[in-house]
Amino acid sequence: MNLIAKLEQEEIERALAGKTIPEFAPGDTVIVNVNVVEGNRKRVQAYEGVVIAKRNRGLNSSFIVRKISSGEGVERTFQTYSPLLASIVVKRRGDVRRAKLYYLRERSGKSARIKEKLVSKDRAAAASQE
């Protein structure tokens, strides 16, 4: 492993200190809690939506979350290892066949729905034991 890769790995470990980022994929509905600083106040803002893209580039990894806010589509890009991310919670697993769900931008209503991924009983039992 070269020097830059080692430095990036150290930065990732430092950014993850005390935090765990769950496994999630495009199509999943997630709640991203973001630390927001307004003047001298600090608060946590929740942003819930569907992951439409995930970019795995080491320290530069990011993901895009799309939600509908008062009838208007809103997309927000988050850096995976940002210190501003308080936590990520996977609310629902989506069953999709694409890595990038940009086609959801043109869709609205029922055509923009995503099927829920069903987990077999064997895997559910194994996951609950861990």
Swiss-Prot record:
Database matches in Pfam families: Ribosomal_L19
An example Gene Ontology biological process: translation
Keywords for the protein's UniProt record, in alphabetical order: Ribonucleoprotein, Ribosomal protein
GO molecular function, one term: structural constituent of ribosome
Tagged with keyword Ribosomal protein: yes
One GO CC term, this protein: cytosolic large ribosomal subunit
UniProt keyword Ribonucleoprotein, yes or no: yes
Family: Belongs to the bacterial ribosomal protein bL19 family.
General function of this protein: This protein is located at the 30S-50S ribosomal subunit interface and may play a role in the structure and function of the aminoacyl-tRNA binding site.
Name of the protein in its database record: Large ribosomal subunit protein bL19
Source organism of this protein record: Burkholderia multivorans (strain ATCC 17616 / 249)
Gene: rplS
